[in-house]
Amino acid sequence: IGIDLYWDKTYLKEQKEVFEKQLRWSIERNLPVAIHMRDAFDEVMDSIYNIGTGSLKGVFHSFTGTSEQLSEILKLRNFLIGVNGVVTFKNSNLGEVLKNVSVEKLLLETDAPYLSPVPHRGKRNEPTFIWKTAEKLSELYGLTVDYIVDATAANAKALFGI
């Protein structure tokens, strides 16, 4: 669920209405949400605060935002940050941004079939490539790949109740 303004803002009003309805449903049913947010940080956050953050929980899928945006998301407390192959890209500053957050707030994602990590960039993404994202986080945090994998798996299990 979420808001995507990458191509245009023609249906922003409708996107916000539907997004807020879906947020309400997630609260009513105590279900986590995976928030898709593309060129719509302010709009997504406005909707979240409009609905209320109390029992809302989830993941900000495919996060590529700024340090300031990350800080705002972390204030929500019940949300994880979804990290995929973008963190491995040569020109991405996502690694620097993520240094401001604990591994215990991260979730590994593939976004398959898109956003393959280096060295598979430009190819169809596959779940097996997630290891490259874990390796990059291992480098960034100075932790073992096993620790990154175990911590992010535990985060996912806790969020989704599995």
Functional labels for PLM-detected ranges:
Residues 3, 114, 158:
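Active-site micro-motifs of SAM-dependent methyltransferase domains
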Residues 92:
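Conserved catalytic/ligand-binding micro-motifs in nucleotide and anionic cofactor chemistry
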Residues 1-76, 88, 96-97, 101, ...:
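Divalent metal-binding pocket/active-site signature
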Residues 34-35, 59-60, 82-84, 107-110:
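Active-site neighborhood of phospho(di)ester-bond hydrolases with catalytic His/Asp-centered motifs
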Residues 104-126:
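Short acidic/histidine-rich active-site segments
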Residues 78-80:
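Conserved acetyl-CoA-binding loop of GNAT-fold acetyltransferases
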Residues 64, 85-89, 112-114:
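Short, acidic/turn-prone active-site loops that include or flank metal/cofactor-
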Residues 128-162:
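Mid-to-C-terminal alpha-helical segments outside catalytic/metal-binding sites
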